[in-house]
Structures are given as structure tokens and as C-alpha cells.
């Protein structure tokens, strides 16, 4: 019997994940023959750390093992953060992305700016230009698509101050460093990616 659908997995795990202080942002279920892979993306206002990802993975694995609808189905389970480039579709996404640069598609124009304070039905966006920094209020209902951008340099203190700062527990976008790690393999490290793109490397294979 294959692992249940994405919708069913979300239904099964949401209460468990919420009890740990996290939200289920998405679930991806893929199958290859008799084996399935389940990738669960979770987040909170303070992001997610390795220990928390491992604990959620353990709890979900125990839950799956106890369900008749999954039974002895072989599967691999991974718990991770959604990553910084996921679309901003809910108010909590905007709140957690405060201080990050985003590409915001509106009707007839695209705005690139730093996400600021979230209000009842709008968000402040700090926009840089030849005349300096300005703050524009954008109605959430006017946003067609918004995606946080990967950054390789730190924003100015003035820009961050106008945006309202970075939420507690989140990292400030930083310079790309350590282009070569100790193993000699080329890599680019971003402090935000290190904090937010947390994966349970051990996973659970069943």
C-alpha cells in the first residue's frame, strides 16, 4: 500500500507538528516503485533548528508506523524548512520574511524591495532608488505573486531599520563566505540558508 496523498499526510501530521510549535507549510510525496519519499516542510516565527527537525521526524515516523493505512510500506521521511525562496502566500509568511528582499508581482508592475511591517491587510516595502530609500504600502490583496530573493550581501542598517528589523530567531542576510569548505568541494554558504534550510540528514528509512 503506498503512502497516503499529500492532503492526507497534512491531515495526519498537522496537530502533531503544531504541538511542537511549528506550522506545516507543505508536504511532497513521491513514489518510486514500492518505495515512497515524504518531505515535510515546517516553519515557525523563529525558524527551525536541527534538533527540532529531528524530533519532528521521529514523532512523525512513529505515527506513520502506527497507522494501518501505511503499515509496512517502505518510505523515507525528511523534515526541513520551506527554504527562503518559497512563495509568500499567507500573512505569517510575510511576517516571518520581514527584513528580506522580495520580488513582488502586482497588476501591471513588479516591485523589488525589502519586506517591512505587516499591517491588517497590507505590508510596508522598503524600496531603494536614486533618491534614497522610500517606504511603500502594498495591499496584500493586490499581490499576484511574491518570492523572497537570495542575497549575497548584507543590507544597510538604515534599510533594515526602515523595514522594522529581522524577526527574533531569524538571520540577517550576509555576505557569501567560505567558497571552499574543508573537503575542498566548492560551496557558497549563506547564514540564512544555514539557519532556515535545515534538513534532517539522518531521516527515517522504513
Swiss-Prot record:
Required for maturation of 30S ribosomal subunits. Signal peptide: none annotated. InterPro entries: Ribosome_maturation_RimP, RimP_C, RimP_N, RimP_N_sf. This is Ribosome maturation factor RimP. CDD domains: YlxS_C (cd01734). It comes from Rhodococcus erythropolis (strain PR4 / NBRC 100887). GO terms for biological process: ribosomal small subunit assembly; translation. Gene3D superfamilies: RimP-like superfamily, N-terminal (3.30.300.70). Residues 178-206 have a biased composition (Acidic residues). One of its GO terms (cellular component) is cytosol. It is found in: Cytoplasm.
